[in-house]
Amino acid sequence: MASLRLFLLCLAGLIFASEAGPGGAGESKCPLMVKVLDAVRGSPAVDVAVKVFKKTADGSWEPFASGKTAESGELHGLTTDEKFTEGVYRVELDTKSYWKALGISPFHEYAEVVFTANDSGHRHYTIAALLSPYSYSTTAVVSNPQN
């Protein structure tokens, strides 16, 4: 359990370090960003399909946004401040297709993160995932919007 906590702390540190770099300055205005890292190759996970859903009043999930991670393993521009309203969201990463493209047979069909957004006022969210063929770990960085 202690090693998992240390791992998550290190992963959060990587996110903060990349946010502080020069490349993160313009992207800090993005209200929802996804970062995916490949733990096997020690590199960004490129071309991972990402789908975002929003929970409706009747409990079903409606498509909200989608895209693929870039060379950096990041996906920006999923939504705008105006559209990213209070609610419950689900981020789904197509991990099976990612590993299959690398010739690896994975255990999981996909990785998902379900979270409540903006219930304490408007915030920006970075969802980070560390993938391996038989496991995944996620963390989030929630911050105030940058002007």
UniProtKB/Swiss-Prot annotation:
Q: Which residues bind L-thyroxine?
A: 35, 74, 137
Which terms does the UniProt entry file under GO BP?
A: negative regulation of glomerular filtration; phototransduction, visible light; purine nucleobase metabolic process; retinoid metabolic process; thyroid hormone metabolic process
Superkingdom: Eukaryota
UniProt-annotated glycosylation sites, renumbered to this chain: 118
> Which residues are recorded with the post-translational modification 4-carboxyglutamate?
62
Q: Which residues form the signal peptide?
A: 1-20
Q: Which residues carry this modification: Sulfocysteine?
A: 30
Q: Which GO terms describe its cellular component?
A: extracellular region; extracellular space; protein-containing complex
Give the free-text PTM comment from the record.
Sulfonation of the reactive cysteine Cys-30 enhances the stability of the native conformation of TTR, avoiding misassembly of the protein leading to amyloid formation.
User: What PROSITE patterns does this protein map onto?
Assistant: TRANSTHYRETIN_1, TRANSTHYRETIN_2
| This protein's UniProt keywords | Gamma-carboxyglutamic acid, Glycoprotein, Hormone, Phosphoprotein, Secreted, Signal, Sulfation, Thyroid hormone, Transport
Which Pfam families is this protein grouped with? Transthyretin
Name positions with the PTM Phosphoserine: 72
Q: Which GO molecular function annotation, any one, does this entry have?
A: protein-containing complex binding
Location of this chain's protein in the cell: Secreted
Q: Partners and quaternary state? A: Homotetramer. Dimer of dimers. In the homotetramer, subunits assemble around a central channel that can accommodate two ligand molecules. Interacts with RBP4.
Family under the similarity heading: Belongs to the transthyretin family.
The record describes the protein's role as: Thyroid hormone-binding protein. Probably transports thyroxine from the bloodstream to the brain.
User: What more is known?
Assistant: This protein binds retinol-binding protein at levels similar to, and the thyroid hormones at levels much higher than, the human protein.
Annotated protein name in UniProt: Transthyretin
Q: Name the species this protein comes from.
A: Rattus norvegicus
Read off the lineage from the record: Eukaryota, Metazoa, Chordata, Craniata, Vertebrata
**Per UniProt, what is the name of the gene that codes for the protein in this document?**
Ttr
